[in-house]
Structures are given as structure tokens and as C-alpha cells.
Amino acid sequence: MRFPTPLVPARLLRRYKRFLSDAVLEDGTEITAHCPNPGAMLGLKDDGARIWLLPNDDPKKKLKYGWRLVELPDGHFAGIDAGLPNALVKEALAEGQIEALRGYSSIRPEQKYGDENSRIDFLLSEPGRPDAFVEVKNCHLRRESDWAEFPDCVTDRGAKHLRELTKIARSGGRAVMLYVVQRTDCARFRLAPDLDPAYARAFDAARDAGVEVLCHGTDITPEGITLTGPLPVDPSPQARD
């Protein structure tokens, strides 16, 4: 998936109020950019970080830049747009790029389901096969070695989604939790139970019930982001209590 216009480099001054960030362009101009990520963004919002912005000339938009990438000190990239993984997965599903989810002719996004007023990211259907309920989560936390971790803060909504998937699996349906790692310096995946113990417990219960856990990496450059192959998921229980 290519960015619609070329990204421009900048230096981050600060990120604040969850969805705002101040940065300085290479010509010295200070601007305010939209930050499309409500999470903690641990390790990705350090003052002075080199970032990449998507400019726009839409007269309806007050902010003329959107923050998209962080260029890490070692040259790797991290994507910070929390909504992008759904678009990447939608594209990959349509092209049959996710081996574990091939063979479904109907791909319906944002379908209502469950007992807790939820919407599944993708409902996959094919005559003669059980429907597949696929939930997608964005992951860009790395703290140790080449481990990608989720979540980077408490996510009650994420735990709710795991509960809904657990119910589907227990009733004999196909339930899939798909994590998309928006970092190029990670090679495997696990949870961060110290940051959200409740999510880790819900994850263990979901996996024990038969929820399939998938993880895919991404290739990230200032030109675009694409979904890559599967990453191994830590098979051990994730909760610490």
C-alpha cells in the first residue's frame, strides 16, 4: 500500500492530547500534525525523533500534515497509524496473501456480532465452510531483543474483543486474532502482561478455547507499507498471575 503523496521528513517536538503532535520540517518551519494513534506509543514519541509526515492540501482539514512513520536510530521504521493495519489486511485478504485465511469468497468488514455490542473487523464467508471472524490489532511496541509486544497500554476494548472471539470458538465457530506488527525490527510476538494483566488473561482464555492467533510483519519505507509473512507467536501462557 503506497502513500497517496510522498512523505516529508521532520523532527518531533512533542506529542500531546493523544491526537496532536508538533514537529519541525527540514526548512525550519514548525507545524502541528495529526497523530492517528490513541495509544501510549512507548518508545516512539521521544522529543527529537526523526519522523515522516503525510502532507495534504484538503481545504476541509485544519491540519495539513499527518504523522505516519518514526525512523528509528538504527535505520528501521515503525508505523504509527493505528488504523492502517485494517486496510493492509483488507488488501491482503482480497489478494489471498494470508495463507491461513485463504479460500473465502466473501470479505465483509465491520460486521456486528456478539453479546457486547461489538463489530468484527472482518467476517469471511464461503459456501460449505464455517464463517471466520477475524479481529485485527495494531502492534508497534518493542522493548527487548526482537520481540514485538501488545498492548502498549490498558485496552478494555481489546479484552472485550477477545471475550467475544472466545464465545465464538467455544460454540464451534472459527475465531481468529490477527496482530499486525508495524515495525521492521521485530521477528516474533508476545504479549506485555505487565502493561495489561487483564488482557493477558483474556488472551490465554481465548487461545485455550480455540481462538487462532496469527501475527504478520510489515515492510515499511517512506514510500509505503505492505504486509509481509507470518511471525512466530510465543506459545507459552502469557498471564503472570
UniProtKB/Swiss-Prot annotation:
Top-rank taxon, per record: Bacteria
CDD domains: SfsA-like_bacterial
Signal sequence interval, chain numbering: none
InterPro entries: SfsA (IPR005224), SfsA_C (IPR040452), SfsA_N (IPR041465)
Annotated GO MF terms: DNA binding
Similarity field: Belongs to the SfsA family.
UniProt protein name: Sugar fermentation stimulation protein homolog
Organism: Jannaschia sp. (strain CCS1)
